[in-house]
Amino acid sequence: MFFSRRLGAAAIRRAGRASLRSYDVVIVGAGVAGLSCARTLQAAGLDLLVIDAADGVGGRVRTDVCDGFLLDRGFQVLLTAYPEARRMLDYDRLRLRRFYPGALVRYSGKWRRVADPMRRPFAGALSVFNPIGSLADKLRVGRLRFSGGRRHATGPEKDTLRALREEGFSDAMIERFLRPFLGGVFLETELRTTARKFASVWRRFAAGDIAVPAEGMGRIPEQLAAELPEGALCLGSRVEALGPGGVRLSDGESIAAANVVIATEAGEAARLLDGRLDPPEFNGVSCLYFEAPTPPLREPILALNGDGTGPINNLTVMSEVSACYAPEGKALVSATVLKAWASETPVLERAVRAQFRDWFGEQANAWKLLRHYRIKHAVPFQTSSPLVAPRVRKGVYVCGDHCDVASLDSAMASGRAAAACLLEERAARA
């Protein structure tokens, strides 16, 4: 059985009822940007309504349930050092489950461990002798860990690959570890993403843990939404256009509001704003989830393709990260595909299974495909740093991960920035 996890009905207001009143603010989009904006405006005492065409909150950050397994819509993680996430979220209530600080790299027929020497000193010392880069490369990683790549965060724009070469990394280190690792973050393996995004996420990797909520990434937007007052969400309703003094829904209903915040994905935001926003290109991804009788890796660790052959870029046994992701006695394997992400399911499944057999042997024949998520607009492809101001015009604002170097954290920060801009202008008008 497959179903989307949703909030309780008490949180949701029907569009017809919403149209009977006027709001201080209507927020279009119930992703993490829109919900963060709503939280900030609610704390300031504004009467608001969040509208989304989907049947649940979260946008791209959602978790489905399939035969007792929790399936995030694409492999996603939370970096615990994200400053905005620390501000907005209650980590204890999320019951975060942390990944091993390092990775397993599949290279030349074997799994090679790369460990953070600051958190796993013994394993880090042993990894010095594996063929995933030279000793000098490992020392450069340590240096970059302490510097956080700050010198790449300012100055002329350059791509991540150039930044790595400026750091002195060898081709072996880049191809066997950094390309698949950062490729899994950016969802592109050419590493053309701006080095400013690289510097931003590298600092967070160095300063904290990689984690997921025990019950799936969807718990993050669900926690944000749970803080809103009853009836502040209008789900299953699509905003067709902005109108004078509010928004018009696709069913013809109009909802009056003094202010409107567009918190949708970039393409939809551009449509609603009549070309006032230039939407970025996006990187796509496929994520395939498999049910396995036993876990092929018995630890909460990220596995990387260091050979560069086959469709899989990275793999994780999610049930080893959090037992909640799979029913008792079963394992959940997540495989991320970048280069061939758009392939049809039967074609991609055959190629992925062939790689499974190469990595894990005949046990992979017994694995059952649960679901294939093909996500066309997964992450904005940013070769330069976008700087989208939250104010579009009087009473209209925009937020989302496309407004800054894209991440879960920047989406939250963008939502709060839009709320702050709105409140400042509202105070000035008063």
Stretches found by the model and what they are:
Residues 2-8, 19-21, 240-350, 355-359:
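Mid-domain catalytic core of redox enzymes
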Residues 62-80, 141-151:
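Glycine-rich active-site loop/strand segments that organize a redox cofactor
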Residues 42-66:
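Glycine-rich FAD pyrophosphate-binding loop
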Residues 76-83, 153-158, 167, 203-225, ...:
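Short beta-strand to alpha-helix junction loop
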